[in-house]
């Protein structure tokens, strides 16, 4: 059985953890903004009324 299955996580979550570990292990001169920004996700939501968009997409913030 796979290690990620034994850990009880999905394959996508396993890949996310592995990618984050690789990015954090890079030498500091290779940790550029473009590399570190790959782990960020942008999410937007749109309100709908009667099947049409009632507003522009709004970013979800923490």
Curated annotation (Swiss-Prot):
Pfam families assigned: ATP-synt_Eps (PF04627)
Keyword match Nuclease: no
A single GO BP: proton motive force-driven mitochondrial ATP synthesis
Record GO terms (molecular function): proton-transporting ATP synthase activity, rotational mechanism
Subcellular location, record wording: Mitochondrion; Mitochondrion inner membrane
GO cellular component: mitochondrial inner membrane; mitochondrion; proton-transporting ATP synthase complex
Modified residues (Phosphothreonine): 52
InterPro entries given in the database record: ATP_synth_F1_esu_mt (IPR006721), ATP_synth_F1_esu_sf_mt (IPR036742)
The entry's keywords: ATP synthesis, CF(1), Hydrogen ion transport, Ion transport, Membrane, Mitochondrion, Mitochondrion inner membrane, Phosphoprotein, Transport
Entry function: Mitochondrial membrane ATP synthase (F(1)F(0) ATP synthase or Complex V) produces ATP from ADP in the presence of a proton gradient across the membrane which is generated by electron transport complexes of the respiratory chain. F-type ATPases consist of two structural domains, F(1) - containing the extramembraneous catalytic core, and F(0) - containing the membrane proton channel, linked together by a central stalk and a peripheral stalk. During catalysis, ATP synthesis in the catalytic domain of F(1) is coupled via a rotary mechanism of the central stalk subunits to proton translocation.
Additional information: Present with 4280 molecules/cell in log phase SD medium.
Family label: Belongs to the eukaryotic ATPase epsilon family.
Quaternary structure and partners: F-type ATPases have 2 components, CF(1) - the catalytic core - and CF(0) - the membrane proton channel. CF(1) has five subunits: alpha(3), beta(3), gamma(1), delta(1), epsilon(1). CF(0) has three main subunits: a, b and c.
Protein name: ATP synthase subunit epsilon, mitochondrial
Organism for this UniProt entry: Saccharomyces cerevisiae (strain ATCC 204508 / S288c) (Baker's yeast)
